[in-house]
Amino acid sequence: MGVVRPMNGILVINKPTGISSHDCVNIVRRAMNTKKVGHAGTLDVEASGVLVLGINKGTKLLNYLNQDDKTYRFDVVFGVTTDTLDHAGTIIDEQPLQSEPDIDAVLPSFIGKYRQTPPNYSAVKVSGKKLYEYAREGKPVPTVDPRELTVHELYRTTPVSMTDNRAYCSFHLRASKGIYVRQLASDLAAKLGTVAHTSAIHRIGAGDFTINEAINLDHVNANTSVMTLSDALRSMPYRTVSGDELFKAKHGQPLYFSGEATQLKILDERGKLVAIYEQKDTDYRAKNVFA
């Protein structure tokens, strides 16, 4: 993996539970002594795992990186639910289970297109106000239209265990961006005729980035190396340019390439990211210039 100092790139963090994604951004700003830090793909406060951060010019890549699928491991308790749909909330309903629910029978119904209504405790905004703000104030939470998502993989990773008329098990999920794992667990329980909440959510992947390359937040400091801009876009097709084409790329002028890629990262002969171009009609136009 290429690294660079001073920092212009991507940092993959293993977010701990108990803090927000924005808290992570502030911690990294202080630790790396830089103001320009952003994140792609918000993680719940009570969730942990992969959080992709852009450092300085790396913030320009976040919109591209946030389009990718996300992968999770999560634990669910069936038979009891909370107002937040996770273990940190207040219990609002209990439906003791008399037998082990047939979870595997309903999992296939979630694969493919899946319409999900965001939970009341979410950062979705209505009239400039987040849904969780309405909920915390005890006000009626506005109705939000369901969103169409895609679930690529959903399966159980542990046996179902029964204790005190509740069922416990863990799952693997790979889905499109924007999914609320807490709500998925609740929807899964509804198909089984019961209620549920998540007891743990751990994001193990975001696009090409995995938990194995994530750094613990408390290990970040001013000397921490970051992933280069080009390496961060590891799946994006590229063209290496020089001479007149390099001049045009640095100045955001149209470029002409054969091929069908809708997006291209433009590199100089040293492999440094110069720009990102998008196909438009018969040529490619600059979307972001980094040179």
What are these regions (language model features)?
Residues 56-59, 80-81:
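Short, charged/polar surface micro-motifs in flexible loops or helix N-caps
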Residues 64-118:
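Acidic, low-complexity central loop/insert segments
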Residues 2-16, 20-39, 43, 47, ...:
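Accessory RNA 3′-end/elbow-binding domains used by RNA modification enzymes
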Residues 127-130, 135, 167-212:
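Pseudouridine synthase
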Residues 30-34, 52, 142-193:
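The conserved catalytic core of RNA pseudouridine synthases
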Residues 53, 74, 128, 184, ...:
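Residue-level signal for inorganic ion chemistry
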Residues 122, 126-151:
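Extended alpha-helical targeting/anchoring segments
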Residues 63-78, 141-156:
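Structural signature of FAD isoalloxazine-binding scaffolds in flavoprotein oxidoreductases
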